[in-house]
Amino acid sequence: MEWSLTQNKLLAFHRLMRTDKPIGALLLLWPTLWALWVATPGVPQLWILAVFVAGVWLMRAAGCVVNDYADRKFDGHVKRTANRPLPSGAVTEKEARALFVVLVLISFLLVLTLNTMTILLSIAALALAWVYPFMKRYTHLPQVVLGAAFGWSIPMAFAAVSESVPLSCWLMFLANILWAVAYDTQYAMVDRDDDVKIGIKSTAILFGQYDKLIIGILQIGVLALMAIIGELNGLGWGYYWSIVVAGALFVYQQKLIANREREACFKAFMNNNYVGLVLFLGLAMSYWHF
């Protein structure tokens, strides 16, 4: 009986950290890899790569914990989130706080193996991860904060590799914010009706009938910024072809969200994993002289 209870608790922690749903970690991973490959340029040192990959999964898990902690009073009123570990009682508030601290401490121990500039930047990463979940109560632009949180690994990666944050770094950071606002608006379109009822704010609500148009403009901005980064760094044809493919994926997403159906909007959100992957493969091909 005791093992059963322990096993159930571990499964609840597993669900709370979303380790059963890797899409969020992947959307955080791809920009991190973009930055590491451009900053190096090429393949980064194995230890730095390992620290950032592990950090992505740990901090994404920590972000999910604090997000559910912040939303614990709201999630029970939304059909999609009512069975999450905190509102369902599978995990207590005290356990959630302890889990968050453990995940952050492990992440920070990894960062301590890097240079001073990266360590200092990691403090801002923690602040963004903590602040984001509460923004949806006060502003219709929480997706912008999410983009900054998901993209802060970009200046950290540049700092870890070169102890500098050049123009390419900040252009990539901006591109990631635009991308995050676009894909998280698609995600927010799934819950828009529920969010309006319980007072949660989002760009999906703010954009209203112009949501598809604004998402399209943001996606064009992402492609333009990534093309500029390619020009600044002398990247090859493989990279530019990846931008073309990413553009085709964005067009497909526009088709999916055309009627604003929940399942289709969620499918469009999930499709962004391929956008990140394609752009990374383009970078890799360019540096490997394909």
Swiss-Prot record:
Q: Which terms in the GO cellular component ontology are assigned? A: plasma membrane
- Give TM regions: 23-43, 46-66, 99-119, 141-161, 163-183, 213-233, 234-254, 268-288
What are its E.C. numbers?
A: 2.5.1.39
One Pfam family matching this protein: UbiA
The UniProt keyword set, sorted, is: Cell inner membrane, Cell membrane, Magnesium, Membrane, Transferase, Transmembrane, Transmembrane helix, Ubiquinone biosynthesis
Question: Which protein family is named in the record?
Answer: Belongs to the UbiA prenyltransferase family.
> What is the name of this protein?
4-hydroxybenzoate octaprenyltransferase
Per the UniProt entry, what species is this protein from, by scientific name? Escherichia coli (strain 55989 / EAEC)
